[in-house]
Amino acid sequence: MWFQLKIEHCPNDKIEEITEELEECGALSITLTDKNDNPVLEPEPGTTPLWPEVIIHALFAQAEEAQYAREQLVAKRPSLHCSLELLADKNWERAWMDDFRPQRFGNRLWVCPTWLPPPEPDAVNLILDPGLAFGTGTHATTSLCLTWLEQADLKNKSIIDYGCGSGILSLAAIKLGAKHVYAVDIDNQALQATQSNAHANHITESQLSISSPEALQNPVHLVIANILLAPLISLKERFHQLLPSGAHLVTSGILEEQAPLLIDAYDSAFTHIATEYCEGWSLLVFTSK
């Protein structure tokens, strides 16, 4: 049995403090969700993106721990609304497993969870469990990037995956023919997730390098960056240093209405050649000048 504590009416400036207290009380996992399904716009690099109204879900193994956490939070912050729910083992397992099925991107790329067989064993199959976070193909921007990679000619190409998250784009690129991918992120947890996913997909060090962005030195054929508008704009010169003339830059993580802002910001260093849209999000393709 599991015990889920749901916390509403949380001031955004207290989210980090509350999650730390939940961890101290024994929470096994903590998830932040958006009450109103709003998009996240332009958080600074290294910060946690927050919505106007955040709901916190904390999972506990013991009822006493969950109840104690509830009492402590409400005692300090009477405005919080905390509700406790009992989850049976089977229901908890289904809650996250039933939502994930193999997904196809383009004609030949599949992303499959470990507990289900690939629908097309001879296709390009990427094994990735949702529990490792940082991107599993379900978000529109990840889908846009995977679909673009699937149709691109990546054979013998060197690629930088800037803001690699789970490593899903890096691993897909390797399986689609890339010679070497440099997966970089400012978040150590993302680097660890990428390493774990690489191991699960039998990707070797000769195919994949995992590091912080500061380690990047050599120019590459392609940079793909599924991050947000503010960091994309700030990284323009860095991307230009890493891409020789004519090399490709693929960006996503930006809303449709933000696309013109990035195109304008990049105009001095890059030529915009293509745009794709999905569910209000955009993917932009540039070549380096």
From Swiss-Prot:
It catalyses: L-lysyl-[protein] + 3 S-adenosyl-L-methionine = N(6),N(6),N(6)-trimethyl-L-lysyl-[protein] + 3 S-adenosyl-L-homocysteine + 3 H(+). GO terms for molecular function: protein-lysine N-methyltransferase activity. Its EC number is 2.1.1.-. S-adenosyl-L-methionine binds at residues 142, 163, 185, 226. Keywords: Cytoplasm, Methyltransferase, S-adenosyl-L-methionine, Transferase. One of its GO terms (biological process) is methylation. It is found in: Cytoplasm. Pfam families: PrmA. InterPro entries: Ribosomal_L11_MeTrfase_PrmA, Ribosomal_PrmA_MeTrfase, SAM-dependent_MTases_sf. Its main location: cytoplasm. It is an enzyme of class 2 (transferase). GO terms for cellular component: cytosol. NCBIfam families: prmA. Methylates ribosomal protein L11. Belongs to the methyltransferase superfamily. PrmA family. This is Ribosomal protein L11 methyltransferase. It comes from Legionella pneumophila (strain Lens).
